[in-house]
Amino acid sequence: TNVREYLKSYDVGPINKLSYTKHHESHAAYGYYGTNSGNTRWAIVVLDSIGEFETYTIWDGLGGRIKRIHSQGYPHSIGLWYSAMTQRLGLVANKDEYLVAQMAKQGNAERYKKDVDELFDINYPSVKFNVNMHRGLDAWLPDADANDLAAAVQSKFEEIIMGISLWLKNVHHYEQVCFMGGCALNKPAIDNVINSRMFQHVHVPKHPGDPGSCLGSVFAKTKTRVDFSDKIWYNSTTDGKGK
């Protein structure tokens, strides 16, 4: 769709110039400028399936600016792997990922741990794969118990998030981290980082996936911090209607 024609349908008035922001930059900007960042240093970890070409980036946020310090591209995608495993478990990819963590509670992660480990080539911060996830994994371990496989997948994902976090803490000495992209919606993995107490602050904003990227695109250009206090952004009258 032509962007100018699309915007005209909303009667936004004359459009003199269009400015574009890269997908992962918009994620990172939303995370950084949507925090009470001030002059403190933040690590922003962006993980999704495919953000144009990038699938996993790490950004340094300091002094009102963000700078990419690590980038990994397709086909090495943690998010795409999790979606492929979602489909392998008989669920709908890009929709039912949250059910994997629920199934994992009923399973034994150790049963297929070795099989899952063999898919990966990890040397943090690099997390790469020995297979192309875009081809799917529908025929992988065809006789595996679904709950046990879900447990192994969720356990590996949590291990990766913790591994990235430890690298940020031990190598770069970050005290604050923000997780962005669809993978940031994996609550058990983020809770593990919070409960480890290795960081002073762990931040995941509302809508860390693609819905938040519209705001991130603006923040990437304006480089202005926005106060996302619930009192300001979610203030409602007693009848439930926003003011």
Language-model segments: residues:
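Short coil/turn connectors at secondary-structure junctions
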Residues: 13-16, 38-43, 53-56, 174-175, ...
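Conserved phosphate-binding catalytic cores of ATP/NTP-utilizing and phosphoryl-transfer enzymes
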Residues: 19-44, 195, 216-220
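Short acidic loop-to-helix transition motifs that present clustered carboxylates
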Residues: 22-28, 52, 184-186, 209-211
